[in-house]
């Protein structure tokens, strides 16, 4: 059947990348189709039941600032919230939400089903319709042809997915779901640069068989933080504890004894696993000097006894899993509900993409999520939103948009993938961002919501809330600038009495806030401030880090000169005199769009960038005189 409706955007896959891609395109007014092999698994948390964490929550806040769904779903489904790095600087603080899988998934599905311009259809995609070098649509498993101006592929671990438990293997996109074989073969036919990656998950445990009394409880923060700029604590369901236990020498001996049947250590799995989320087999091998490793028992939800033992991801045979679980303190009688497993899947070298996440080889075809070599819900959601918005803009022949490294962690993510490529699952960290003081979790809305509004991603309700917040920040900052404390006036005396600090000369309340040991709560009490915690936090960080932030702005201004020098798409690196063969090949492979991007390619020297710049200028002058 040839479906009668022509879509602007078709999104294949209903995971974290696919849902954000479909929602973004539909919010922008494009006729959008979301194809999923199973409507019941939309927004499924395939691995750990958590959103956020170091570097990751910055991405979640950016998705949220652009109108995305992930943060609000985390607030509606979060059963424990914590601020990580709370004693460190503002740049590296991160919110983490332990999520109820069912509630989170329900929140995502509700958002999808109530989104205007979005159709959902349950059917696996088997083929892409490609005419010449342009995608024209999708063919489903049943042979239904859907036509579209653009297509976004968000296939997760489903492309050629193989599940491993010990030396046993089976085809699957994740436990209980079939893989995407026909589509994987079709993509290989298109000569896109394909590789294999691997990820894994731990066995799930029945909480009724665990002795929590010998474990360390890990409560959430109080008052509970929220994930979304539109979130409220009243959205949160009941809050619960996680628990901490540890592996031991017996556990490690059991694991070592099973390595001869491990698919990772016998060469059965060829795909590379995530460096920063290693399996328990990897941990005892790489960190053989350690006597134990932490295990976090995380509830999967309020209406289930299922626990996620974070820290013991494994693909060892089930009999070994059974023994290793029962060797851990408090889990001596543990019942395993689901075995752990590893999954191997196809991914495509992200250097074959443009910075808009469109493939260089096929016009109108976009990739987002694990297909690009990343790991994590947050990384997937960020790519999905960007791919969805750019597919939407291309469909209407509008200029596409990707944030720069100084604008967003999304920009860092995309720039790293396209410029550097990846041979192992890529995870976001704050350390990857050179301008992290400007790219804080708390100011994602200041950085992106105005842009999102211009792009059509941000609705009236979110825009009004953002404008109200920014007006409150401006009003309160102005008020504090005009309140003065002096050694002999009432405000000055109250300040000294409250804080025990010295006050030798007259200064404004803003100047008092600049002091290292003074926080906004104290200034609010001193001056009778009634603004929200969010507004107070914004003011405090802006005041305390003003000098550092200004220096980063100066660095950005210098970089912009390189960013503004575009490299023509048809630029011939072979004619650049003095460029080594190795550097020429690297530049031809990546085809950077600006001199700044060229400078970030490993092995491309400042001298090489200078040679390219000189050649571009010569070419431009030749064109002018011609």
From Swiss-Prot:
The keyword Translocase does not apply. Belongs to the MnmG family. It comes from the Bacteria. It holds the Pfam family GIDA_C_1st. It comes from Acinetobacter baumannii (strain ACICU). SMART domains: GIDA_assoc_3 (SM01228). InterPro entries: FAD/NAD-bd_sf, GIDA_C_N, MnmG, MnmG-rel, MnmG-rel_CS, MnmG_C, MnmG_C_subdom, MnmG_C_subdom_sf. One of its GO terms (cellular component) is cytosol. This is tRNA uridine 5-carboxymethylaminomethyl modification enzyme MnmG. GO terms for molecular function: flavin adenine dinucleotide binding. Its cofactor is FAD. SUPFAM superfamilies: FAD/NAD(P)-binding domain. Keywords: Cytoplasm, FAD, Flavoprotein, NAD, tRNA processing. NAD-binding protein involved in the addition of a carboxymethylaminomethyl (cmnm) group at the wobble position (U34) of certain tRNAs, forming tRNA-cmnm(5)s(2)U34. The keyword Cytoplasm applies. One of its GO terms (biological process) is tRNA wobble uridine modification. It is found in: Cytoplasm. The lineage of its organism: Bacteria, Pseudomonadati, Pseudomonadota, Gammaproteobacteria, Moraxellales. The gene is mnmG. NAD(+) binds at residues 273-287. Homodimer. Heterotetramer of two MnmE and two MnmG subunits.
């Amino acid at each position: 059947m040839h479906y009668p409706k022509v879509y602007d955007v078709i999104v294949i896959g209903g995971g974290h990348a696919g849902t954000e891609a479909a929602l973004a395109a539909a919010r922008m007014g494009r006729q959008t189709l979301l194809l999923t092999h199973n409507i019941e698994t939309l927004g499924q948390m395939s691995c750990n039941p958590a959103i956020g964490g170091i570097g990751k929550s910055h991405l979640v806040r950016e998705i949220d600032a652009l109108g995305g769904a992930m943060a609000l779903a985390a607030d509606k489904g979060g059963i424990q919230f914590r601020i990580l790095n709370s004693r460190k600087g503002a740049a590296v603080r991160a919110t983490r939400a332990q999520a109820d899988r069912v509630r989170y998934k329900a929140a995502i599905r509700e958002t999808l089903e109530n989104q205007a311009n979005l159709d959902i259809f349950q059917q696996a995609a088997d083929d892409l319709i490609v005419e010449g070098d342009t995608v024209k649509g999708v063919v489903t498993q049943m042979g239904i042809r859907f036509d579209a101006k653009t297509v976004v592929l968000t296939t997760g671990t489903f492309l050629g997915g193989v599940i491993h438990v010990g030396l046993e293997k089976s085809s699957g996109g994740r436990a209980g779901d079939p893989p995407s074989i026909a589509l994987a073969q079709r993509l290989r036919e298109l000569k896109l640069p394909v590789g294999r990656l691997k990820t894994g998950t731990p066995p799930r445990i029945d909480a009724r068989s665990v002795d929590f009394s010998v474990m360390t409880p890990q409560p959430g923060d109080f008052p509970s933080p929220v994930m979304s700029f539109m979130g409220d604590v009243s959205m949160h369901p009941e809050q619960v504890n996680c628990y901490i236990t540890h592996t031991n020498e017996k556990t490690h001996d059991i694991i070592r004894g099973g390595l001869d049947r491990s698919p990772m250590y016998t060469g059965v799995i060829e795909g590379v696993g995530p460096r920063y989320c290693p399996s328990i087999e990897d941990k005892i091998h790489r960190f053989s000097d350690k006597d134990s490793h932490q295990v976090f028992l995380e509830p999967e939800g309020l209406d289930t006894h299922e626990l996620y033992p974070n820290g013991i991801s494994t693909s060892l045979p089930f009999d070994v899993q059974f023994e290793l679980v029962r060797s851990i303190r408090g889990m001596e009688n543990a019942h395993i509900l689901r075995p752990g497993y590893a999954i191997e899947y196809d991914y495509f070298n992200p250097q074959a993409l443009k910075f808009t996440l469109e493939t260089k080889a096929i016009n109108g075809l976009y990739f987002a999520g694990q297909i690009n070599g990343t790991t994590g819900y947050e990384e997937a959601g960020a790519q999905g939103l960007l791919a969805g918005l750019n597919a939407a803009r291309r469909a209407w022949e509008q200029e596409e948009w990707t944030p720069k490294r100084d604008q967003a962690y999304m920009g860092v993510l995309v720039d790293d993938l396209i410029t550097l490529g990846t041979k192992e699952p890529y995870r976001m960290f704050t350390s990857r961002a050179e301008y992290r003081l400007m790219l804080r979790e708390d100011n994602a809305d200041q950085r992106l919501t105005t842009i999102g509004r211009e792009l059509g991603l941000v609705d009236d309700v979110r825009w009004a809330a953002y404008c109200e917040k920014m007006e409150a920040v401006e009003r309160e900052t102005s008020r504090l600038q005009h309140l003065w404390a002096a050694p002999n006036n009432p405000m000055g005396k109250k300040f000294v009495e409250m804080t025990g600090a010295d006050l030798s000369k007259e200064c404004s309340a803003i100047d008092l806030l600049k002091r290292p040991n003074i926080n906004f709560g104290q200034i609010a009490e001193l001056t009778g401030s009634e603004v929200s915690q969010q507004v107070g936090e914004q003011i405090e960080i802006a005041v305390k880090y003003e000098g550092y932030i200004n220096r980063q702005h100066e660095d950005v201004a210098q970089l912009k000169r390189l960013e503004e020098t575009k490299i023509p798409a048809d630029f011939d690196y072979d004619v650049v005199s003095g460029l080594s063969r190795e550097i020429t090949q690297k530049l031809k492979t990546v085809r950077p769009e600006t001199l700044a991007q060229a400078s970030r390619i490993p092995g491309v020297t400042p001298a090489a960038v200078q040679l390219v710049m000189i050649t571009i200028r010569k070419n431009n002058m030749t064109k002018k005189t011609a």
